[in-house]
Amino acid sequence: MMDPLDNGLFDLPDYEHTEDENFPPLPPPHSPGADDEAEDVANGDDWTENAGQTQREEAPKPARRVVKRPQPKLDGQRLASQRGLPALRHMFDDVKFKGKGHETEDLKILLRQMENWAHRLFPKLQFEDFLNRLESMGNKKEVQTCLKKIRMDLPIVHDDFLSEEVVVQTEDHAIDMPSEDFSFPDELHVPSPSQPVKVDLSEETLQRIERNRRLALERRMEKMQAQAESQALSQATQSDPNEIPDDAFDAEMLDAVESMTGIPTASQSPPHVDKDLSLVLHSHDLPVQDVSQSPAPCPKPQGDAPPEKALSLVHSALPSTSDPTSPRKPLTEQLPDDADTSSATPYTEAPACTNTKEEY
């Protein structure tokens, strides 16, 4: 038998001086397209070289965010749309209320119609929440504009414009030309003037226009009547017929003063002087002006003295009749009787104005 040691069967190889073999890396786990990669590896292609390029090609793109069903919003534009406030104009055309005595039932019908309108406009909200949202949106510009158009009976939505049947007709103003063909240059062609537009309105529109015109005339007449009444009242308060004018009052006061002071006028007869009065004046040694002498000039009034001041001066100059020691008799005693009127000697014409202080 042969010895295995002799044959060198158990000799270990010299790993210190040998180099490791280069083995290809392990393939990736099984995935779609792994067979192709296995074939590449079998064919000697290195998949690591194309790894970066494969990742760039297979990188997923960011998905675009698309809203498929946008949720409706209760804003001013939706409230002014065809299902919004304009729909309320014709909602109660077919509704019949029972009238007096059935107010509760009529109110239920009204609320039911309003709830139906709110649900059609925005089904997402309950009726109470819809009313709260509607109240907060009343100040928006779109809502205010829509309300003004409704009050003025103006067209709002597209159907309102279609209901107004407007027919525009153009008339043919062509001039009869001869049968021969004439060629005119382009410079001589003048554009035809604008043709008159004939508008045919419906009967309902004409009735509405007539009603608005009548209401405007009534308001104008009421306004003019109110202005006329106010002007008449102001004129009546300014010129009161019961008020006495100042010039009439001054004339009456002047006549009263003249009658009390005893100043005769040109139309009055000269006064009669009693003999007893002259004797009394001589007994008290009072100076009496001679008739034959010229009358003393009447003093001119200083400024525009009021009649009350002249009256007070006259009363202060005359002696009092209530005093028993006064030399002047009462006027009742000075007046002559009817029997003595014929025997009394008439006095000569007295001057127009005498000095009262010098006479007495």
UniProtKB/Swiss-Prot annotation:
GO CC, sorted alphabetically, is:
chromatin; cytoplasm; nucleus; replication fork protection complex
The record's GO molecular-function terms, alphabetically, read: DNA binding
GO biological process, any: cell cycle phase transition
Q: Which UniProt keywords apply?
A: Cell cycle, Cell division, Cytoplasm, DNA damage, Mitosis, Nucleus
Q: Bias regions of kind Basic residues — which residues?
A: 62-71
Sequence segments annotated as region (Interaction with TIMELESS): 74-150
Outline the segment boundaries, as ranges, of region: Disordered: 1-80, 178-199, 220-246, 289-360
- Which locations, inside or outside the cell, does it occupy? Cytoplasm; Nucleus
Return the Acidic residues bias intervals. Answer: 34-48
Q: Where is the composition biased (Low complexity)?
A: 225-239
Which InterPro entries has this protein been placed in?
A: Csm3 (IPR012923), TIPIN/Csm3/Swi3 (IPR040038)
- Per the record, the domain of life is Eukaryota
Q: Which family does it belong to?
A: Belongs to the CSM3 family.
Please describe what this protein does.
Plays an important role in the control of DNA replication and the maintenance of replication fork stability. Important for cell survival after DNA damage or replication stress. May be required for the replication checkpoint induced by hydroxyurea or ultraviolet light.
- Complexes and interactors: Interacts with timeless, which impairs timeless self-association.
Q: What is this protein called?
A: TIMELESS-interacting protein
